[in-house]
Amino acid sequence: MKNRKSKAGNKLNILFTCIGRRVSLLESFRRAARRLKINASFLGTDTTELSPALQLCDRQFGVKPTTHPGYIKQLLSIVKANKVTLLIPTVDLDLKSLSQNKPKFAALGCHVLVSDPAVIDICQDKRKTYKFLHKNNFDTPATASIRTALKNSKSSIVNSKSETRFPLFLKPWDGYAGRGNAVVNNRRELLFYARRIPNPICQELVKGIEYTCDVYVDFGMKVRCVVPRKRIEVRAGEVSKGQVAKNRRIMNEAVTLVEKLGAGPGVITLQLFLTGDDKLKYIEINPRFGGGAPLSIKAGADFPKWILQELTGGKPNIRFDGFKDGLIMLRYDSEVWLGASQ
C-alpha cells in the first residue's frame, strides 16, 4: 500500500460505512487526527439521514442497502468523487462485499480496512467458525445442526440416550449483533425456536465470565496489541457496561488465534467465555471494530492513532500491553439535534 502523506491542503478523506450510532468511534478518529496534526475529513454512509453518527460526519452520503446489487458501485463512486484514502466498515453487513472488491477500491487509491474474503467467510458462517476453532485446537462450544442435536446420538451435545442436554443455545449461523439468539430449555422449545430462527444452529450453553478482545493487526499483518474486556452488561448485542481486564493468558492465546486465521489489518474482535473450570471457550470472531472498542481506546490502545500513523507512512510505537487495566465504561444515550423550521 502506498503511503498517504497529509500536508496542508492535502487532506485525508476517511469514509465510514454503515456508520449508524458509532459516534464515539468517529470522535476517536477526529481526536487522533488532531493530535497527529493530520488534516483529515471524515465521511459517512448510511441508508437513512436519521443516523446520529452520520449527522456528525463532515460529509454525509445516503446509500442503498448493503444487499442491493448497486451498493459497491455507489461506494466506489463516493470514493472516487471525494478522493477517499481509507474506508472503515463498522458492521458485519458489508464486510463480504467490501473484501471481495478491495482491488477496485485500491485502484482508486483507497485502502479498505477489511480482511481477505476467506477470513470473512470463516467469521460470518458460524459453522465454519466452529470448524476453524476446533481444527486449530481452540476450545469452543460444541455445535451441531438442529437435526443432529435431536437425532444423532453421537453428537457431542446429546447423551447416549439421544436426549438433548438442555439448556441449549440457538442462533443463526449467519447472524450478527445477537439477533435471533435464544436459550431453549426443553425439546418443545427447541422445536419452537428452530422454526422461527432463520438458518439455526445449536450449541451447548456456556456459562462463565464473558470477554471481548480487541486485537490490533498492523498493516504488515502482525498482531501488535490485545485488549481483553469483560462484558458486564449487553444491550441489543453491544456492550453497555464493560471493564478492561489484562489477562495474559487470554492476550497470548488471542495472538495465536488471529495469526492462524490470517485476519487483518485493523481491529479484530474476539468473543469468549472463561468458564468455571478455567477453560477459554471462543464463541465469535468479528473482523471489524467492535461496539465496545471505545473502552480499549480510552484505556490507551489508541487504534485510530495507530491506523492514521500507518496510513501516512509512520511507524506507531505500540506496546503489546500498554493500556490501563481495570478501566470501566458505563454507557448512556445522548442526542443529536437537527434543524427545525422557524
Give, region by region, the residue ranges found by the protein language model:
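Short, charged, surface-exposed secondary-structure boundary motifs
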Residues: 70-74, 115, 121-125, 180, ...
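ATP-dependent carboxylate/phosphate-activation module, predominantly the ATP-grasp catalytic core
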Residues: 179-188, 194, 203-263, 267, ...
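Peripheral (often C-terminal) accessory segments that flank ATP-dependent C-N-forming ligase machineries
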Residues: 1, 156, 275, 305-342
